[in-house]
UniProtKB/Swiss-Prot annotation:
Family: Belongs to the LpxK family.
Catalysed reaction equations from the record: a lipid A disaccharide + ATP = a lipid IVA + ADP + H(+)
Pathway stated in the Swiss-Prot or TrEMBL entry: Glycolipid biosynthesis; lipid IV(A) biosynthesis; lipid IV(A) from (3R)-3-hydroxytetradecanoyl-[acyl-carrier-protein] and UDP-N-acetyl-alpha-D-glucosamine: step 6/6
Name of the protein this chain belongs to: Tetraacyldisaccharide 4'-kinase
Organism, as annotated: Chlamydia trachomatis serovar D (strain ATCC VR-885 / DSM 19411 / UW-3/Cx)
GO molecular function annotation: ATP binding; tetraacyldisaccharide 4'-kinase activity
Sequence positions that bind ATP: V68, V69, G70, G71, T72, G73, K74, T75
């Protein structure tokens, strides 16, 4: 019961971010956000304090998480990790809570199938992962301990998506991803800032990865909290695919491209900066809260706005694309998804060592079970 209580508090606070970042309203209610942030940090401390001994399963459990509310680029990392382990001959499943998906509340787990499910059913991130990973390997259930128990016999490795704060399951490897431009979520707990956990808990992570470059002061603080070498990654555009056009856009056509951009991300500034770094001219934006999809009316109005500014199309992330589904085909103005992958720009040797360590743990478990 207490875990449902804490989950309910977390969901409520995440929902409040819509109001907490709304300009003048946020300024007027700053005192309220500070009070709620104090309560939230207390609930986080209490949850860690009363956590019981975690349950162990026979498969190797690898957690990928963060310490802030959204916006670190965790989904592309989970995708890369699952594919990298698969290339090493390890069977791997992604276990997700299925946040914002109505099927996550079912007593039985759901195997995500892009041909059958929508983002409203299973959540946008699990649906996106299932688009690229082998059939049957992305599973959702709110009770991830039970989900792990039911999946452990079928896979070598279980990737626990957003698992750093999940205390009910033993994790063999803890990976934490932080955003290089704001690794500590503004220095305050949500909703005053973006923290969802204490930065000091980075000491418990086996590997800390940084998405983008840090300022020297943030890098020093990260090194103080987690002395081991950090792995630095950077997202890059791999391709732009039009959802309602018969042709795609060659890379040499990106320079100077005038577009509108809509997205529902925890940290949209990073996505917009990546587009601008690629030479794409952003004529206007329509920003939604994390995990929230755009409606047909909103998209049509935004398209008209960008047409008036002489734009050639609308771009969104793949996470937004899976939420709109076939809606793009009802729009005559070009709508495209930006496909991203990351590259390791610092300490690739440690990233390979991380994969080696996961493989070694799995082999040892196989021998002892």
């Amino acid at each position: 019961m207490r875990f449902s209580f804490f989950s309910g508090i977390r969901d409520l606070f995440r929902h409040l971010i819509i109001s907490a970042t709304s300009g003048a309203l946020s300024d007027r209610l700053g005192w309220l956000w500070a009070v709620i942030a104090r309560v939230f940090s207390g609930s986080v401390w209490l949850r860690h304090k009363i956590a019981k001994s975690p349950h162990q399963v026979q498969a190797t459990v690898v957690s990928v998480g963060n310490i802030v509310v959204g916006g670190t680029g965790k989904t592309p990392l989970v995708l890369w990790l699952a594919q990298a382990l698969h290339e090493r001959g390890l069977s791997c499943a992604v276990l997700s809570r299925g946040y914002k998906g109505k099927y996550s509340k079912k007593k039985a787990f759901t195997i995500v199938n892009p041909a059958l499910h929508t983002a409203s059913c299973v959540g946008d991130e699990p649906l996106l992962l299932a688009k690229y990973l082998p059939s049957g390997t992305v599973r959702i259930q709110k009770d991830r301990k039970t989900l792990a128990e039911k999946s452990a016999g079928d896979f070598d490795v279980l990737l626990l998506d957003d698992g750093f704060q999940y205390n009910r399951l033993h994790k063999d490897v803890e990976i934490v991803l932080v955003n290089g431009s704001d690794p500590f979520g503004g220095g305050s707990f949500f909703p005053k800032g973006r923290l969802r956990d204490f930065p000091e808990r980075l000491a418990k992570a086996d590997y800390v990865m940084i998405n983008g470059r840090c300022s020297p002061s943030d890098q020093r603080e990260l090194d103080r909290l987690h002395p081991e070498e950090k792995i630095v990654i950077e997202p890059q555009i791999s391709e732009i695919v039009w959802l309602n056009q018969s042709v795609n856009m060659p890379r040499d056509h990106w320079e100077g491209l005038g577009v509108g951009v809509f997205c529902g991300l925890g940290f949209p500034k990073g996505f917009l900066a990546m587009l601008r770094d690629a030479g794409i001219h952003v004529l206007g934006t329509y920003l939604l809260p994390d995990h929230v999809g755009i409606t047909k009316q909103e998209l049509e109005l935004f398209c008209k706005k960008i047409i008036l500014r002489q734009g050639v199309g609308i771009l969104c992330t793949e996470k937004d694309s899976v939420k709109i589904g076939a809606l793009a085909e009802e729009i005559s103005f070009p709508v495209g998804e930006v496909r991203m992958r990351f590259s390791c720009v610092c300490n690739e040797r440690r990233m390979v060592a991380m994969l080696d360590a996961i493989e070694a743990i799995q082999k040892n478990k196989r021998v002892t079970t």
